[in-house]
């Protein structure tokens, strides 16, 4: 039960569990801990909960993935996520979605989206919190956290609070306009945790090489379906999108999590076609056709013209030697470039790196440095692929902690 403790002469509101961060992980953990009968205070510095939920999935929230498994996550400690994901699976969250009569559908590749709006997921979480008596307080900034014997004391803009269990669910650094800060990392550092280097993940690439940038700018808004993008031995087959500043689209966002500055990426623009064989047969069947005419059957007319102009000499197919045709096939199947950088946290969907999971219990999410302190969600060094995996990590890690706080 909530009560009051006197500490150094001032009234301190006591809650057994305090959770900082009312995003996906924080809301889920609050609801589940409260369902166990724990009195929970959920704090956030923002004026509204779940802002990132509302803008996710183009406003429809890709809330999980049917094919979620540990292989879909990046971490310096890849085994860490296995326990939580096994104990609260994608189907457990789907059950919750069904319980609240939220209509949903699979878009593709196992990605589950709301039929209506992302607010259905936020409202579901808020309803669960409300049902179990979670005390949600917004517009509350945390000024200091102090370790007490058997708990923690928080000095906030809304007064003094103390707790037995303190859960940090403040997310990473991505999309600062939605309120992202490095608060969780500061808390971890304060209590002796190791922080692994952070960088933007699931983020578009920027291009500065003049000719390549001109190509991207000219083709801005053009999408090419089902390309295979490769970097450092990892590949993804998805769409790519040309932008004014470089390259984006699902395949690019996915590979960005495996890219380091200076690395080259390779793009197969036509993985579904045996290009050498196709070009040879076209040369035989249509010797007078120009290369750009041929390319216009595979890409938009504008893209075909630009590629023919910048990459190749467009001439009738009969004038190409076998070696020249081979070079055309090679370029289309292995377009290699070195991005100048990424768009950074401003547009990144996630933050790579974070709190070293080797210092956190994979069963309970509790700190091994400071008993009673828990970390869940994106603040940890666990990053999912694009497609609902990061939400599933939020639900699973929140559920894990909620059973023990």
Q: What spans do the regions from the language model cover?
A:
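Glycine-rich active-site loop/strand segments that organize a redox cofactor
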Residues: 60-106
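N-terminal Rossmann-like FAD-binding beta1-loop-alpha1 element of flavoenzymes
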Residues: 15-42, 401-405
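Glycine-rich loop(s) and the adjacent beta-strand/alpha-helix scaffold that form part
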Residues: 165-209
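Feature captures the FAD/FMN-dependent oxidoreductase FAD-binding
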Residues: 87-165
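Glycine-rich FAD pyrophosphate-binding loop
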Residues: 34-58
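Short hydrophobic core segments
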Residues: 18-20, 142, 161-177, 240-243
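A glycine-rich dinucleotide-binding beta-alpha-beta segment and adjacent secondary-structure elements
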Residues: 138, 305-383
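An anion/pyrophosphate-binding glycine-rich loop and adjacent beta-alpha core
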Residues: 47-49, 54-55, 63-70, 103, ...
């Amino acid at each position: 039960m909530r009560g009051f403790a006197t500490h150094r002469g001032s009234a301190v509101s006591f809650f057994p569990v305090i959770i900082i961060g009312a995003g996906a992980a924080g809301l889920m953990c609050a609801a589940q801990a409260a369902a166990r009968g724990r009195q929970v205070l959920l704090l956030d510095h923002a004026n509204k909960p779940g802002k990132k939920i509302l803008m996710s999935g183009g406003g429809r929230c890709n809330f999980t993935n049917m094919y979620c498994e540990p292989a879909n996550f990046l971490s310096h400690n890849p085994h860490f996520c296995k326990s939580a994901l096994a104990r609260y699976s994608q189907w457990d969250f789907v059950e919750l979605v069904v319980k609240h009569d939220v209509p949903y559908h699979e878009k593709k590749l196992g990605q589950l989206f709301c039929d209506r709006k992302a607010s259905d997921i936020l409202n579901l979480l808020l309803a669960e919190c409300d049902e179990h008596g979670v005390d949600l307080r917004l517009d509350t900034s945390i000024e200091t956290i102090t370790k007490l014997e058997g708990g923690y004391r928080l000095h906030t803009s809304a007064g003094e609070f103390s707790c037995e269990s303190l859960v940090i669910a403040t997310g990473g650094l991505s999309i600062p306009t939605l309120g992202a800060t490095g608060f969780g990392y500061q808390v971890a550092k304060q209590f002796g945790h190791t922080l692994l280097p952070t960088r933007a993940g699931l983020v578009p690439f920027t291009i500065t090489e003049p000719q390549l940038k001109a190509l991207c700018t000219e083709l801005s808004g053009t999408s090419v379906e089902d390309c295979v993008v490769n970097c450092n031995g990892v590949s993804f087959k998805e769409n790519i999108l040309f932008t004014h500043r470089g390259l984006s689209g699902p395949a690019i966002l996915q590979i960005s999590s495996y890219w380091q500055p200076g690395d080259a990426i390779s793009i197969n623009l036509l993985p579904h076609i045996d290009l050498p064989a196709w070009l040879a047969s076209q040369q035989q069947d249509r010797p007078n056709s120009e290369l750009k005419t041929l390319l216009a059957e595979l890409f938009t007319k504008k893209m075909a013209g630009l590629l023919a102009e910048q990459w190749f000499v467009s001439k009738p197919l009969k004038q190409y030697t076998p070696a020249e045709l081979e070079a055309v096939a090679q370029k289309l199947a292995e377009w290699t470039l070195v991005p100048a950088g990424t768009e950074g946290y401003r547009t990144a969907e996630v933050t790579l790196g974070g709190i070293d999971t080797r210092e956190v219990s994979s069963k309970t999410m509790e700190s091994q440095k400071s008993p009673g302190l828990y970390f869940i969600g994106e603040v940890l060094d666990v990053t999912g692929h694009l497609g609902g995996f990061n939400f599933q990590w939020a639900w699973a890690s929140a559920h894990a902690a909620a059973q023990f706080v």
